[in-house]
Each structure stands twice: as C-alpha cells, then as structure tokens.
C-alpha cells in the first residue's frame, strides 16, 4: 500500500521515497520537503480508508470518492485545493494556460457526466470484467477530472479499489503506479490517445501489460521476503535466551521495517529495555540486521535494511 502511494505521488512530481514515508510515520525527519511526505502519507490513509469502506460494503459512488479525496488532501499542499469538493472552475491538463493545454476536461457545470461513470463502476446496466472495468474507469475519471487537484492520484487509487471491490484482490497488492512511473511517457500518451482518437485498444493493452508485469514483480518480491524471513530466523537461533524476543521483533519488522522502540512495544508487548537490548544485538557487526538512523541516544529509529532493499526493487 505504501509503495503504491509513493509511486503514484512520484508520478505527480513529489520526491518522497518509501524510506522517507516510513521515517515520517515514526516521527522522524525525512530527507525531502515535509509537504511531499505529508501528501504521500495522506494517500496511504485514503487507500486504507477506501479498502475499509469496501469491506463495510460501501459501493464506489460520488460520496465515497469525495470522502477519499478529502482524506488524500487533508494536509500538505492540497489543503487549500477544495478537499472533498467537486471543482467549480475550469481546469486543463498540461501547459501554463488553457490555450497551451494538452487536454481540457469538461466544464464544471457538466460534471453530472460523472453519474455515468458511477453506474458503470457499479455494473449498471450490465457487469464488466473487473480488469477491463478498472482500466476504463481510470481513464474516464482522469478525463472528467472532477477535482481542482489530486485527480491523478485518486484516479490511480480507483484501480486497486475496484479490484478489491470485485474480489479480484483481497488487499491492494498490485502496485500499478510502479509500472506507470517507469513508463510515464507512454502512460500519458495512451491516456491522451483515448481522449483524442478513442483508441481504447492501445490503452487496454498497456494496462494489461502493467498488470502482468506488476503481478510478476509482486510474486518475486513475496518469494524474496519469505526467504529472507527464513534466513534471518535461522540467524537468531544462536542468541540463546534472547532468541524468542528477537523472533517477535523480527516479525514486527516485517510489518514496520522502519520503527522506533515505542512502536515495537506496541507491536510485540515486550518491555522497552528488552527491545533496546535486542535491537543493539541485531545491529552488531556479526548480524547487521538493523541499523540505527538518528545517531542519538534517545528517540532512536531503526531500519530493517535488507527488507527495505527488497521492497524498493523496481522492474
């Protein structure tokens, strides 16, 4: 989920990395502008909220989309751009002025056209294959551009939500924004081709390639993480009485690979002193499973380096 948020936001120009986001979540200081990390964090919250709403049997409607937009724009640069409200003004895509635009979405007074997309997403008048539905809904949302800002990220967020809602995925494990970012120019060209020439076929082929490549990469990463857990559990066996606590902490690091002592207390129930001793041991030269990021004696933050390296792999 965090990886999708980071990549989708990078498509829009933010500089936050996955490590920056996780450091921010531990109240550390990321190495990029705070607004960038706040925007990515808001995206994570919006995607989490969307999955929660779908699990609560909410349909994907105007109401939910507005709620998710508000959640995604609640802090950072977007806070002044009408969070959760459809735009009242004309916008354009590309260029500094409307006469330089690559594409001009419908006027604000025609946003009722969104109703047709809402019906399509909810299989009215007839159902559509989930992958095709996600692909077409993304383009249509981007074309309508219903908000003043944040349309790109929210349009990409629609894809995993539709796949979860249709039971193709149990959780938003497909990070299509990784593929879209790597092939950003083609991504934009395929969207534009649909708007100008109605070339849906090329867009669908591109989208299917994205799904296939992303799924393959996700399986590869999952296999590497499974192997990593096995290898590192074995490394803990010689730790004697510390092994059980270290094993609990390792499990927690698979959930939060950048973490502080307080978070580990919350995740494991172990005493702070015990956690401190284990983290000190895991950072020693014969193991080096974690590294301390702050250089401070208090409020230390630790990174599970190998896990992060695997998660950061690109295509």
Predicted regions and their residues:
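FIC/Doc superfamily catalytic core
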Residues: 1-315
């Amino acid at each position: 989920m965090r990886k999708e948020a980071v990549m989708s936001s990078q498509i829009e120009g933010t500089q936050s990395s996955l490590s920056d986001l996780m450091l921010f979540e531990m109240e550390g200081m990321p190495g990029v502008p705070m607004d960038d990390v706040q925007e990515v964090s808001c995206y994570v919250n919006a995607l989490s909220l969307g999955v929660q709403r779908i699990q609560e049997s909410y349909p994907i409607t105007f109401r939910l989309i507005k709620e998710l937009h508000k959640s995604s724009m609640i802090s950072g640069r977007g806070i002044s751009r009408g969070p959760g409200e459809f735009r009242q003004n004309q916008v354009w895509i590309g260029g500094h002025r409307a006469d330089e635009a690559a594409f001009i979405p419908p006027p604000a007074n025609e946003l009722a056209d969104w109703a047709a997309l809402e019906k399509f997403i909810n299989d009215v008048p007839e159902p559509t294959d989930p992958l095709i539905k996600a692909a077409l809904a993304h383009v249509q949302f981007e074309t309508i551009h219903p908000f003043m800002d944040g349309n790109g990220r929210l349009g990409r967020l629609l894809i995993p939500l539709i796949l979860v809602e249709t039971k193709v995925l149990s959780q938003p494990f497909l990070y299509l924004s990784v593929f879209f970012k790597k092939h950003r120019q083609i991504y934009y060209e395929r969207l534009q081709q649909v708007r100008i020439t109605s070339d849906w076929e090329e867009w669908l082929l591109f989208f299917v390639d994205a799904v296939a490549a992303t799924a393959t990469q996700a399986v590869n990463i999952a296999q590497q993480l499974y192997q990593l857990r096995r290898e590192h559990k074995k490394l803990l066996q010689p730790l004697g009485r510390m092994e059980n606590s270290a094993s609990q902490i390792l499990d927690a690091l698979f959930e939060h690979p950048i973490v502080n002592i307080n978070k580990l207390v919350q995740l494991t129930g172990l005493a702070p002193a015990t956690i401190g001793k284990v983290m000190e041991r895991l950072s020693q030269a014969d193991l080096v499973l974690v590294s301390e990021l702050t250089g401070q004696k208090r409020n230390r933050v630790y990174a599970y380096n190998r896990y992060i390296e695997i998660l950061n792999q690109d295509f």
